[in-house]
């Protein structure tokens, strides 16, 4: 029996209306699916439509034409929006825009109160969510005393407490320093290992390299789609789209040009190290004959 996708985007188009006679097209006939447990990265330069697309995935925005389905629910149905948003939670670029309470644990509980979770279960969910993001010791702190990475972890905890099937990260690390990014990526890695469905919108190619699948947008259309290895193999196309590739991918290609036996489709630093070690071992074996 074929598994149904958790999210299905079907021929979606969207435009921002400036006035009654003027609109700006942002998405054009976009179609893709996200399976349960999958980690999908959406990339594209500024203005490509990726953040607009992310907001389609839980009904914040609704298509002009086409449909978005979440666990069989159409986002056009306003009566289903609460269920859809419990299924697909969003974490945005600025955590301050998501934090509403003056104490960390109260902020985690806020969404649970709104959906009528009983107090005993609420306490359990808050405890579990704070533990999941490594913020249990900060539960009594005011959010404004936290670092950017810590605030973003609180925002993620607030979503996790709702027990969603999928989390959408819309440029969730773009405003953080390197340490804050590492904090969030560690949390994302943990969620992924536990089977959470993740959709991330990002311009950090090192994050994209960790995904199962990459969707590349240009002027509101999908122009590339595949595994990170398949997408990053197309260096020239990515350059034309004004997108970077991971440094590891650039280095692997350069070494391959100089030494064709070296694999060119490497996208992570650890893969480069292992390939270098493999060739060192081969040289030792040859010289020992």
Give residue ranges: language-model regions.
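Conserved ABC ATPase "signature" C-loop
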Residues: 220-221
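ABC ATPase NBD Q-loop/coupling interface
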Residues: 67-83
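The feature captures the beta-strand-to-loop junction immediately N-terminal to the Walker
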Residues: 43-45
